[in-house]
């Protein structure tokens, strides 16, 4: 399952902004970077008119697995999990979240990875 369009984080400027300004939360198999999108410099043209206040992206490196099938399976797993967890969330401001999986994540089963993801989202204050 793919993240709904209104929940996707797109554009290299968004990712650059998250890397420079975002807060980092670490676990043994992933890193969560979170930032408040209202702090970003306004880009001329389009204003953000999203009905959803949380946008996400997931990065899975070739170091995690050389097989694209495995990486895509992990990506789909996380997209499905995030769309279920964050679909009914409402925040006052727009939040951008970026999850990077570490190469050590392949040692863990899927359920453990999803629990770690939930812990990081709670630690970041996105979910309760």
UniProtKB/Swiss-Prot annotation:
**Which EC number(s) does the record attach to this protein?**
3.1.26.5
Catalyzed reaction equations: Endonucleolytic cleavage of RNA, removing 5'-extranucleotides from tRNA precursor
One example GO MF annotation? 3'-tRNA processing endoribonuclease activity
Q: Which InterPro entries match?
A: Ribosomal_Su5_D2-typ_SF, Ribsml_uS5_D2-typ_fold_subgr, RNase_P
Keyword Nucleotidyltransferase attached: no
A GO cellular component entry from the record: ribonuclease P complex
Q: Alphabetically list the UniProt keywords.
A: Endonuclease, Hydrolase, Nuclease, RNA-binding, tRNA processing
Question: What is the superkingdom listed in this entry's lineage?
Answer: Bacteria
The record's Gene Ontology biological-process terms are: tRNA 5'-leader removal
What is the purpose of this protein? RNaseP catalyzes the removal of the 5'-leader sequence from pre-tRNA to produce the mature 5'-terminus. It can also cleave other RNA substrates such as 4.5S RNA. The protein component plays an auxiliary but essential role in vivo by binding to the 5'-leader sequence and broadening the substrate specificity of the ribozyme.
Q: Which family does it belong to?
A: Belongs to the RnpA family.
| HAMAP family referenced in this protein's UniProt entry, alphabetically | RNase_P
Oligomeric state and interaction partners are given as: Consists of a catalytic RNA component (M1 or rnpB) and a protein subunit.
This one is known as Ribonuclease P protein component
Natural source organism? Prochlorococcus marinus (strain NATL2A)
Phylogenetic placement of the source organism: Bacteria, Bacillati, Cyanobacteriota, Cyanophyceae, Synechococcales
